[in-house]
A protein has these predicted regions:
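Positively charged n-region of N-terminal signal peptides that target proteins for export
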Residues: 1-4
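Bacterial N-terminal signal peptides
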Residues: 8-19
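Signal peptide processing junction and immediate N-terminal pro/mature segment
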Residues: 17-28
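Sequence context surrounding c-type heme c attachment/ligation sites in exported
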Residues: 27-30, 36-39, 46-54, 58-61, ...
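Short, polar loop/linker segments at the starts of domains and inter-domain junctions
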Residues: 65-75
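Short, structured beta-strand/loop micro-motifs enriched in basic residues and often containing a Trp
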Residues: 73-85
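Ligand-binding pocket segment of bilobal, Venus flytrap-like solute-binding proteins
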Residues: 88
């Protein structure tokens, strides 16, 4: 978990929040959009089916630590709901209930016919950022489902100092690290 947290801080590639475009809420873009679910304690229930969501980017070995890594580092794949992506492409704003999922895989190599390079090995982590003013006064909250060798079914919001503050200060657009993901940069509406 400790190795993964610095990545979560940077992750939300898109992590979205109030941002340069102002704090006004954008309503959920579509009633069919998968929305965050919470248990009775307020913990986020781990989203399912995200593999069919819009893939917005990937990175390998991205870290916010000065420590050198051995090997290529972890693979990070980022997904959001198709409706949230479409709303961003149309308006430049992420709607309420937007979720970004950061899926972390260990690097693997030299399996089967592969003699060089790396590919995604076992999944080792999952982090989620959620834009939901009903559950987070700041607008966005970050959750880590890492629980040792398995993923937890629910997660409490992490303290704002762990992810939110960094996203608020460094994210390119609406608390999301759009700058790291060409798919989001290209989707952003351009002014005439």
């Amino acid at each position: 978990m400790k190795r993964f947290l610095p990545v979560v801080v940077a992750f939300v590639p898109a992590a979205v929040f109030l941002g340069a475009r102002g704090p006004a809420a954008v309503p959920a873009s579509d009633s069919k959009m998968a929305t965050p679910r919470y248990d009775k304690t307020g913990a986020l229930v781990r989203p399912e089916g995200f593999e069919r969501w819009t893939f917005v980017g990937a990175n390998i070995g991205m870290s916010y630590s000065q420590e050198a890594q051995a090997g290529p580092g972890e693979f990070h794949n980022i997904y959001t709901q198709p409706e949230a992506y479409a709303a961003y492409a149309a308006t430049g704003r992420f709607p309420e209930k937007t979720m970004f999922l950061l899926v972390v895989h260990e690097p693997a190599q030299k399996v089967s016919i592969n003699k060089s390079g790396y590919f995604e090995g076992p999944m080792k982590g999952l982090a989620v950022s959620v834009k939901d003013r009903e559950h987070s006064p700041e607008g966005w909250a970050f959750y880590s489902f890492d629980e040792g060798a398995k993923l937890a079914a629910t997660a409490k919001a992490m303290p704002t100092a762990m992810c939110f503050d960094c996203h608020a200060k460094h994210a390119d657009d609406d608390h999301v690290f759009v700058q790291f993901h060409p798919i989001l940069r290209q989707a952003r509406p351009r002014s005439p």
